[in-house]
Amino acid sequence: MNIHEYQAKRLLHEYGAPIANGVAVYSIEQAEKWAKKLPGPLYVVKSQIHAGGRGKGKFKELDLDSKGGVRLAKSVEEVVANVKEMLGKTLVTKQTGPEGKQVNRLYIEDGADIERELYLSLLVDRAVGRVAFVVSMEGGMDIETVAEETPEKILTLPVDPVQGVTSADCKRLCDALELHDNARKDGEKLFPILYKAFCEKDMSLLEINPLIVMKDGHLRVLDAKISFDNNALFRHPDILELRDLSEEDPKEIEASKHDLAYVALEGTIGCMVNGAGLAMATMDIIKLYGAEPANFLDVGGGASKEKVTAAFKIITADPNVKGILVNIFGGIMRCDVIAEGVVAAVREVGLKVPLVVRLEGTNIEQGKAIISDSGLNVISASDLDDAAQKIIAAVRGA
């Protein structure tokens, strides 16, 4: 689960991280009221959407030469003018796709006298099985680009889960970021704070880009992105309250109601599979034969007929889907249950695109018989390779 920048900053501030004074607003009237209460004279007006690249993004409704989704203002009047131009508009960034995201809230905060911009994040380093700091002097940039072009400029520092962030860890991080005097003292306080927040709140990513050194020599969190482990949210009702459903894909929201692992993608082949590994293999072979999957969907090992029906409805609700591939290896999951769910869903929502079904394992013969006796226009496949080729051929021939 993701949260907005202002929510992330508020959470980090509760742990003691240094942030600017700021307020989230939902209307022009609120913007004027609260901007007057900020010290000024420099303000920053930030679009709040779950996507990066906001500063370089463009609003669909405005001219191409208009400013992006993060703007500076030198007076309350300029703040209000920018809010009028940004609120309710559709912001397109490199992460939103061409459809963009509507800006329903803005964050207004004090400007900062920036001396240097740094990059800092915490994530789970699966190679060593530990939470790790990732830091770089190249703040404000796309860290993926830095990693690809100049990987030597990045330090990855795994943290011992027993000892936590040690003084030696702080020294390495401060040295890597070339922090001195007040900034170094701030860093020695900040790094353990961030690690504590990451672990206590079950985060999967905490990214500060940039972390700035101000001209007075102190550190400040200028931008923050936090993602949480969905499987741990039951422990954090306070975090669940921060969820903004308007920022999430409606299909993914519906899938979560049925305990389905679903991720929307940008392809045209809808996939329904049991097991994450088999689901990824299914997507891989679709790409191998020159097409793109429209989703990742794992119905799990013990799905019911109702769950399978719900999964099928979610796939068919995607207008980009031009064909559907059902790939089931029945171990705990029985092929006849899958077949019953598919048949029930097709009869309820109709079948407007080609459907290929590959079944293998427990009760395979019963499953095939259910589909065969249904009278539906379903293409059977003998194995995964055959299934992938058949669905792609059917879509291209449609």
UniProtKB/Swiss-Prot annotation:
Substrate binds at N274, G331, I332, M333. InterPro entries: ATP-grasp, ATP-grasp_succ-CoA_synth-type, ATP_grasp_subdomain_1, Succ-CoA_synthase_bsu_CS, SUCC_ACL_C, Succ_CoA_ligase-like_bsu, Succinyl-CoA_synth-like. Its cofactor is Mg(2+). Mg(2+) binds at N209, D223. Pathway: Carbohydrate metabolism; tricarboxylic acid cycle; succinate from succinyl-CoA (ligase route): step 1/1. Coiled coil: none annotated. It catalyses: succinate + ATP + CoA = succinyl-CoA + ADP + phosphate; GTP + succinate + CoA = succinyl-CoA + GDP + phosphate. Residues 9-254 form the ATP-grasp domain. ATP binds at K46, G53, R54, G55, E109, A112, E117. Its EC number is 6.2.1.5. It holds the Pfam family ATP-grasp_2. Binds 1 Mg(2+) ion per subunit. One of its GO terms (molecular function) is ATP binding. One of its GO terms (cellular component) is succinate-CoA ligase complex. One of its GO terms (biological process) is tricarboxylic acid cycle. Keywords: ATP-binding, Ligase, Magnesium, Metal-binding, Nucleotide-binding, Tricarboxylic acid cycle. Succinyl-CoA synthetase functions in the citric acid cycle (TCA), coupling the hydrolysis of succinyl-CoA to the synthesis of either ATP or GTP and thus represents the only step of substrate-level phosphorylation in the TCA. The beta subunit provides nucleotide specificity of the enzyme and binds the substrate succinate, while the binding sites for coenzyme A and phosphate are found in the alpha subunit. Heterotetramer of two alpha and two beta subunits. Belongs to the succinate/malate CoA ligase beta subunit family. This is Succinate--CoA ligase [ADP-forming] subunit beta. The lineage of its organism: Bacteria, Pseudomonadati, Pseudomonadota, Alphaproteobacteria, Hyphomicrobiales.
